[in-house]
Amino acid sequence: MSTVMKQPIAGVTAPETREVTVMTVWPTLGAYGAGRVIGQLCSIRAGVGFFSLGKLLALLLIAPAIGLYVFSLLPGVTKRYRLTNRRVIVQAGLRGVDERWVDFDRFDAIDVEVLPGQEWYPAGDLVFRNGQIETFRLAGVSRPETFRHTCLATRRGYLGAAESQ
């Protein structure tokens, strides 16, 4: 039995055909001010040998961290970052309503900015730039270098396809 694919390469769809998801990531606790404070406290290295003040505080801060995590999952608060074959989108709520986005032709570089407290998670902010101008920011992205690399690779593919037409 043969199947006919709608695209020449499995999983690859031309941007002008339809928008498809490449990758979705959820912000860490490092996206929130309270989460960054928790990260800063847990990063304190003062101590003796294996034991540090930060590790002790990490144990004491488990309950507030869980509370912040549950808060981040509330329907009016939850967010996710969706990379498609056309743009990068911040989606809000349980249904993933597009809140704001940046098209691939609106930036030429992505910087990783690790704010105090985010390094403990490990997380960082992705700063999308067009020249020296910040055009978009994703807060508290987990393992930001991976998502940055995927965004840039997808952007290159999009712009390459657009130039060839």
Q: What role is predicted for each listed range?
A:
Residues 1-165:
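N-terminal basic, Ser/Thr-rich segments that initiate or prime the first beta/alpha elements at protein or domain
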